[in-house]
Amino acid sequence: MIQCKKEYLIEEKNINSLVTQAKKILNHRKMLYNRYIGKKRTEVDVPLEFYSTNIVSGYFGGKAPEYSIKQENNKKKIKIITDFFNKAIGKNTDAEEFQLLIDYIRDYNDDSSFFYNLVKDYFMTGACYGLTYETKDNEIVYTHISSLQCVAIYDYSAPLQKIGLLRVWQELDNDGFNCNMVEIITNDSKFYYKNSKLQPNEYKLDKDMSEKITWKLTPAFAVENVDNLAIFEPVISLIDSYQQIIENNRNIFQYNDDAKLMITGYRPSNEMFIQDPDNPENNIINPERIKEDEIYLKSKVFYTDDTTGKIEWIIKNINDTASENHKKTLMELILMTICVPNVTDVGFTNADNSSALEKKFFPLEQAIIQADKQFKKELLAMWENIVDRIN
């Protein structure tokens, strides 16, 4: 979230400052996205971010919200509202016709995909965005846009009012160089700015692309987590610890797989090092010793000259019980903190009725209450904007 006055937002000289603020937010979201897709720069990747995001997104966003139009017929209630707010309701309205219009707009916008993509972005990066616009055929379109490009802009009022949306992305200019494109959308304008290779911190208005628009509200859907957190962000350190245990065990297994053979009570026929024929001052590994070692390694039976001799592999022992208990504790802490059920545990697989399953998902329902309220508020604002546009 960025806060400023609308007058500040539309001044060309302020664009670099706004982009700088936005990039700090977007870089953090990029880090979260990289964790989700498994780019952690480690040899072993435990995709708990992927698991938790998909479970919560499917639970909350698997079914798009339903909209119903209510036509008020209670004359007493109509009179009270009309007198109190000086606003007529229920006049010249047809609920069925209006419902058909809403359903038609939802159908051609693929409302279920739009909603799910928003939800997934929200839980993955802590924010989600969409744009609303009218086509040349006078169709109202709302579409999802990546949270890796956008930041909502609010004023200083209480409650906060959304006054714009800033979107930034990279594209090639006419000379083949990367430049930053900036789009700022308000309820009455779309401004486009871009920088150049020679002046990366100076953004110039593109008058040809910029245009005036007419909307009651900013035609942008924006839900940002009030704590700026993705669903898995509070447990990143625990996930890293869990991953470290698995990586440590993997390294030990690899070490044991490549273990050295220790032989006592026997002396090989050939020395390990001999003088380099080409450079007498240096020693080299004796090739005959290598051959001798290979013969003994491949041999099924080996005899030592000394009765006290023995043969054994130099390996590291793993305390498997302690390792598994530590992993189990970490997994329980991770899933408990983010309120995501473990669908592989015995309690979940043995839940043979809907009541038992509901108990498993009860913590998750509590965790998404805030998101539910935020989405409902923003969806109602989006439809208020669309209805006002139609009227």
Where does each model-flagged region fall?
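C-terminal amphipathic alpha-helical
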Residues: 112-118, 319-391
